[in-house]
Amino acid sequence: MWPERIKLIPPKYPVSRLEDMPEPNEESSGIDMQELKLRQRFMESGFNDNLKSHVGATGRYQIMPITGKEYTQITGKTGDLNDPVYNEQVRDFYMETRLPQFKVVSEGAPTDSVKIAKILAAYNWGPGNLSKHITRLKRRGVDVEKSLDWVDTMPAEPKNYVNFILRGQDIDKYRNNEEYQKALKKYGLK
């Protein structure tokens, strides 16, 4: 069972007991966004800024060309998706503006963790797939607004993606990854 609000678990060790979890800082959302971006980048590209997937997703955050074009049309900014700075700008734009349906819920405010989990799932699985899944869960009476238990009902890829980024699950697999360790040091997250 997920707690209502969580902080990202430091990569050194997974926290398994609720009472061991740090209290969220009142001034923040309870989510360390720098660590979240680092974990997301690791999941998307393994820190390979020039990675191109078989479906055409490019760069550190695996941006699809259509998303890059949409970013250019709306912002007027152009660039190469292989450019790490530009790729990150497109990712930030997409996360902040193109997934609004997962940020605000009319029936009671979801916790920050729930919002972030939905945005991550939509980023990885696609907003349409997530919307359909949430609709099915709500019909079955599953509360997707105040708990993160619904994350484990998704298919393996988006479930593992969200779990790794938010829970730090399977972090031991990656702890000895040289690129991950370099990035942790670079961002002072050792």
Cite the ranges covered by each PLM segment:
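Amphipathic alpha-helical interface segments
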Residues: M43-E44, Y94
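Conserved alpha-helical segments that form or flank metal/cofactor-binding pockets of metalloenzymes
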Residues: E44-L51
